[in-house]
Amino acid sequence: MVEYKCLNCKKIIKLEELGKRARCPHCSYKILVKLRPKVVKHVKAR
């Protein structure tokens, strides 16, 4: 599940809500930031 955050209104938007437009559906701002996944990845040190 891909989520984006609007830099103007700070609301979290799912990919299904966007459609083909890369704009916030709430405030029509064009700049969205892709959020990092909530899963923590552990890497073994060598």
UniProtKB/Swiss-Prot annotation:
Organism of provenance: Methanocaldococcus jannaschii (strain ATCC 43067 / DSM 2661 / JAL-1 / JCM 10045 / NBRC 100440) (Methanococcus jannaschii)
EC number(s) per entry: 2.7.7.6
Per the record, what are the reactions this protein catalyses?
A: RNA(n) + a ribonucleoside 5'-triphosphate = RNA(n+1) + diphosphate
GO BP: DNA-templated transcription
Q: Does the keyword Transferase apply?
A: yes
Family that this chain belongs to = Belongs to the archaeal Rpo12/eukaryotic RPC10 RNA polymerase subunit family.
Q: Where in the cell is it found?
A: Cytoplasm
Q: Could you say which enzyme class this protein belongs to? A: transferase
Q: How and how many cofactors are bound, per the record note?
A: Binds 1 zinc ion.
Q: Which cofactor does it need?
A: Zn(2+)
Q: What is this protein called?
A: DNA-directed RNA polymerase subunit Rpo12
**Per its UniProt record, what InterPro entries does this chain match?**
RNAP_P/RPABC4 (IPR006591), RPABC4/Spt4 (IPR029040), Rpo12 (IPR023464)
Is-annotated flag, keyword RNA-binding? no
Keyword field: Cytoplasm, DNA-directed RNA polymerase, Metal-binding, Nucleotidyltransferase, Transcription, Transferase, Zinc
What's the gene? rpo12
The record's note on quaternary structure and interaction partners says: Part of the RNA polymerase complex. Interacts with Rpo3. Forms an Rpo3-Rpo10-Rpo11-Rpo12 complex upon coexpression.
Provide GO CC annotations from the record: cytoplasm; DNA-directed RNA polymerase complex
